[in-house]
Amino acid sequence: MKRIYFLVLLVFSFCQSSAQTIAEQSVRIKSISERWELADSTRKGTFLLTSYKPFYFSLGRWSSNPNRQPHSENPAYSVPTPTDYNKYEARFHVSFKVKLLQKIFWGKGDLWAGYTQKAHWQIYNTGVSRPFRELNYEPELILNFPIRYKFLGFEGRTLGVAFNHQSNGRELPHSRSWNRVMFHTSMERKNWQITLRPWIRLKDEDDENPQIMNYIGRGEVTVVYGRPRHQIYLVATHPFNKLNRGSAQLNWIFQIRNHLKGHVQMSTGYGETLIDYNHAQNTVGLGICFVDW
């Protein structure tokens, strides 16, 4: 229950801090300059909590293939007995960032701290006392630089590097984690935005998920398309080898009334959560969105 109270408190605290921003807009795509404060006109200073990735709550999420007995290529991290998880659960996705330093490295760079958390809650599963099936914690340190370039009609806006840690905070045999150095660049054109994020995994002596790169992948692309009252975005990963795994997640955010926004999500592939890094499934979720791109 403590985890439930923490998540609820986190949701309402962030909603309150973002209330003014949300109240000023419906569903619209923010420019990259707005999101990363690249120009003097968009700078808000340091230590101000702002949105990072979308913030939503899926009231219902269906899986074609629930991961009832997670396994790893490292035998110490394979679960010996299955748990009777439902195909239906709820999902939280919370994400925010804060600028720690600005105009560093010749007055061009900004240093950000980012945090993303997702939680999969078996709220409809009374048979196993409605547990949280999986929680993933993802803190980041992000060094971001403004840049100008042209690519296929798109205008490049940012270039940077980040240190990313992701874990589920659990004990053996459910523990999963990895550390990455991630490179990123973002570009935009009218109603479109594209972000590319290739990464390098850092070595882990006690590897809980040895083949994670061959399942989740070695890079990610995010494509966002925005129109009045609607926003569609795709997040895809790929290992860039002959295994042809990875994942694809398609999202639709739409205005219902005033600032109430609906959220539909469909995904396929591996690694929806860390415990599922080598488990393939198709999912569909329906809920509400508090903060979009």
What are these regions (language model features)?
Residues 1-21:
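Bacterial Sec-dependent N-terminal signal peptides
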Residues 21-167, 180:
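Transmembrane beta-barrel domains of Gram-negative outer membranes and organellar outer membranes
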Residues 77-81, 119, 159-169, 194-202, ...:
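Transmembrane beta-strand segments that form the barrel wall of outer-membrane beta-barrel proteins
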Residues 85-88, 126-129, 169-177, 211-215, ...:
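Solvent-exposed loop/turn segments connecting transmembrane beta-strands
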Residues 94, 139-141, 161, 181-185, ...:
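Membrane-embedded beta-strands of outer-membrane beta-barrel proteins
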Residues 96-105, 144-152, 189-191, 227-229, ...:
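Outer-membrane beta-barrel proteins
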Residues 107-111, 153-159, 190-194, 217-219, ...:
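Outer-envelope beta-barrel architecture signal
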Residues 264, 281-293:
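Outer-membrane beta-barrel "beta-signal"
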